[in-house]
Amino acid sequence: AQKNRTDYIRRALERGKYVISDTPMTLNPEEMEELFALAREHRVVLVEKLTLVYLRAFTQLVWLTHGALVGDVVAVKCAVSQDDFEGGKNFNETVSQALCACIKLLGKDYLEVNTNAVKCSDGEFIYDMITVKYPRALATIEIGTTVDVENELVIIGSKGRITVPNDWWNTGYFEAKVEGQEFLKRYSFNFEGNGLRYLLQELMIM
């Protein structure tokens, strides 16, 4: 299926079509560069459907985090039940959203990535814990299939924490507990549909 996706993208670009692809487009970095070069050659737009990054609430979350709302970020914890994620996407599609969230919050200058997959007796993948180590922070990504994983995104800072409950990949609400403040800060934004409309809005102004 992954190979078919890449082939479909290549053929569409060669025909001068704009392409919005499920993520990941390909698992090969060189192939990814080739596809973007092909898009430039044919003067069309190629984007991955990482709708999370186009949501107003998530953009605000990143802005507040980088603005030290909860101080220096020391950890980002991202958990997702694969069955709850858009009807049960495959592992690569699920982990792409989680990695995107971590990189938007902590940046691209990580030191190492480790994965710890757990399989059941018949060899089927049931759980994975991925750790991404940064110079002064740690990101953990927890993905479960048949095991109970509570969907949430938590940002732990030196002066508090921010929590995005439930289906954080459709961020519409988050709350912050800031050191020295008695009450939670709550942030709520309208969210409609599956997020695709927000990506399309961005494409309209490209």
Residue positions per predicted region:
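A contiguous active-site-proximal alpha/beta segment in oxidoreductase catalytic domains
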Residues: 3, 26-85
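Rossmann-fold NAD(P) dinucleotide-binding segment
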Residues: 3-22
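A general structural signal for well-ordered alpha-helical segments in protein cores
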Residues: 5-9, 32, 58, 98-99, ...
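Short, well-ordered coil/turn segments that N-cap beta-strands
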Residues: 17, 44-45, 135-137
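Hydrophobic residues in well-ordered beta-strands that form the structural core
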Residues: 21, 46-48, 164
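Contiguous beta-strand/loop segments that form the cofactor/metal-binding neighborhood of enzyme cores
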Residues: 93-171, 200-206
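C-terminal helical cap and adjacent loop that interface with cofactors, partners, or active-site loops
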Residues: 182-206
